[in-house]
Amino acid sequence: MTLVSGKPLSRYPWLVRLMLWKQRRSYGRVLDPSLLWGRSPRVFAGLALLYGALDRRSSPIPPSLRSLVTVRVSQLNHCAFCIDVNSATLARRGVPMEKIAQLSEWRTSPLFDADERLALEYAEAITRNGVDDELRARVKSRWSDDEIIEITGLIAFQNLSSKFNATLDVPAQGFCRIPDGTARDISTPRQ
């Protein structure tokens, strides 16, 4: 059961309606979380600006790596909406569906390279229980300070977003289907 619902579009301030219109043009529909965030227009605007800054074209983190991290954090936080929309973005960024379907098994899958493994390990540590000194040293030896800030900010943002959506029980909106075409939850390994 959803804890909070959106309200009729006419009841949102003009700035929120403009943001929702832009989403409809980009995604073909309004994203359900935006109807919730839109209840607090200033927070919604700040959130949108932060996401835009973190997922910009000029980011020092490659687009596919950014998307891998956002999907994995979404899986860890059991956010159906985030897994759905971020997996669709990951596929649009050229990552094969087979790899997306194996994301929860990244440690043993041969489909992930060293950079991806480090980013996913870092994302899991931040999301689950914190980063130890050994992992900090590996991150520091691989990425520049600016890259560390960018990827850490993205992971923190995705934790905020996915925990918000999971807590409010925001459902998937059907953006991404896994290879076999079923609705299997890609957050857990195959049995």
What does each model-identified segment do?
Residues 1-191:
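Hydrophobic alpha-helical segments
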